């Protein structure tokens, strides 16, 4: 077992920009790069291993070959690979949308529902996003406002700043606004129900599909209760600062702001995913120098469970998002 640098598939949705290509090194033939799927075993876009014995094979193929123990004991409760991690560049507004919970999604769509979190990497001045409702409404009012295009009168629009954290529980109405760059950690699902899309058309020249009936069945009609900040306070450790961004039954996410070095322990409990969002760093272990990795801005790696201890060392300051399963 060894740390694996991953190559991310990219998506060219109509609302995307160019920052992921220009600033984060994502390779795509499209003019727009809306999303890069940094950690994915989903059928709609799979991470490919870039180094070592499994170079050129998908992460899913590696897991199938080596067995689910590489995911760790804490992943034993999941039937499928549990998470999907993305970088999202919203040059334009995303649709107003909602994701179903596990029970509904598994029954209707044949895959997990989607609870997710957003870590705001950057935001234009005045940027905002839609996060639930201002106040509780009835299901009848919800359906009527969708019908007469007045839904946005009762939605909760929140100013967005770099470093904000939004926990989007399944069933929460939401929309990322234009001018926002986000790291998204979510359940392994690509099920989205669009409710409102500003009258836009897709590449085929036709209005993009809406999913009103399903959205009405799964949307929570009460305001969100989570604060829009990290779940924990910054904790100073030797060489770096660690902040718990969010933790739930599906994922735990921390921000590492590294001055000199950070220690990463890949225990038997869970794999670890590291995503560099600023700067660069060397990932190394004293006992396997051949598996040393250089990770630059926008690059990520998968460390199998039980791989041991690693040192993450930047030439200068470096910011990393670390995800694992508890």
Q: Which stretches of residues belong to each language-model region?
A:
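Acidic/His-leaning functional-site neighborhoods
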Residues: 231-299, 307
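Ligand-binding loop in jelly-roll beta-barrel domains
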Residues: 78-80, 88-93, 102, 112, ...
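Short, structured patches in soluble enzyme cores that scaffold and shape functional sites
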Residues: 98-100, 121-124, 133-135, 146, ...
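Short acidic-glycine-tyrosine-enriched beta hairpin
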Residues: 154-167, 181, 285-307
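His/acidic/aromatic-lined binding-pocket segments of jelly-roll/cupin-type domains
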Residues: 85-86, 94, 116-119, 157-158, ...
